[in-house]
Amino acid sequence: MADQSIISALVLGLIEGLTEFIPVSSTAHVLLAGHFLGFRSPGNTFAVLIQLGAILAILLVYFQKLLSIALALPTSVRARRFVLSVLLAFLPAALIGAAAHGFIKSVLFETPMLICVVLIVGGIILYVIDRLPLTPRYTDVFDYPPSLALKIGLFQCLAMIPGTSRSGATIAGALLMGTDKRSAAEFSFFLAMPTMVGAFALDLYKNREALSIDDIGLIAAGFIAAFIAGIFVVRSLLDFVSHRGFTPFAIWRILVGTAGLVGLWLLG
């Protein structure tokens, strides 16, 4: 197993874990890293399986909360309403994602220029929304009404365009509809769980014939890197956005997108 392949796997896993849950688009960063730095994914199954590291990271960090919600379901109307809200928010992306999976993967994911432009546009939008003098009406994810959750889920569908960011779309939508920054980020975490598990299962099924024991070392390296980085981000993000908002992520998006466009122009 070549050292370069291991380094590529670790870098891609690290990028996946660091960017999956923040509003900068993990897909854009992984694809642009592959395009400009030569860190090529060992295969479609590698890209799918390192996402499992990020999924397990958020499930581990939120295990106690998830267990408390599950135990409260038989007796708590609030817990049942919250679960319903998350499922309603998940539904639009599940339906559209399953129907448009082939087009998204084969067409949109192969367009680096589109990804860079979307990074910049999304960064500008996130910056403007973060600076708006909005008055929050919802500060606790357990108080989100199902109708609000469904609207946030519709925003999540925008993330099917590479470079948009799943968390960025849901957070922007939530802020515009009256949530505070911390709860918007936390609801994005909860919504990520069924969304990422569903996307992982669909991608794994679509690529089932490409599974190979030969790539197990590379997959393990990327998986572990994504898992460790994901834990760090999930544990620190809520406090970060409570104090600093989303402007740093907006600026990062604009810088990465601009650098990507310049790189594409220079490379012809």
From Swiss-Prot:
Organism classification: Bacteria, Pseudomonadati, Pseudomonadota, Alphaproteobacteria, Hyphomicrobiales
GO BP, one annotated term: regulation of cell shape
Membrane disposition: Multi-pass membrane protein
Transmembrane parts of this sequence: 5-25, 43-63, 84-104, 109-129, 184-204, 213-233, 248-268
Pfam families associated with the record: BacA
GO terms of molecular function: undecaprenyl-diphosphatase activity
GO cellular component terms listed in the entry, alphabetical order: plasma membrane
Stored InterPro entries: UppP
Locations listed in the record: Cell inner membrane
Protein name: Undecaprenyl-diphosphatase
Catalytic activity: di-trans,octa-cis-undecaprenyl diphosphate + H2O = di-trans,octa-cis-undecaprenyl phosphate + phosphate + H(+)
Record keywords, A-Z: Antibiotic resistance, Cell inner membrane, Cell membrane, Cell shape, Cell wall biogenesis/degradation, Hydrolase, Membrane, Peptidoglycan synthesis, Transmembrane, Transmembrane helix
Function: Catalyzes the dephosphorylation of undecaprenyl diphosphate (UPP). Confers resistance to bacitracin.
Record's miscellaneous remark: Bacitracin is thought to be involved in the inhibition of peptidoglycan synthesis by sequestering undecaprenyl diphosphate, thereby reducing the pool of lipid carrier available.
EC number: 3.6.1.27
Protein family (similarity comment): Belongs to the UppP family.
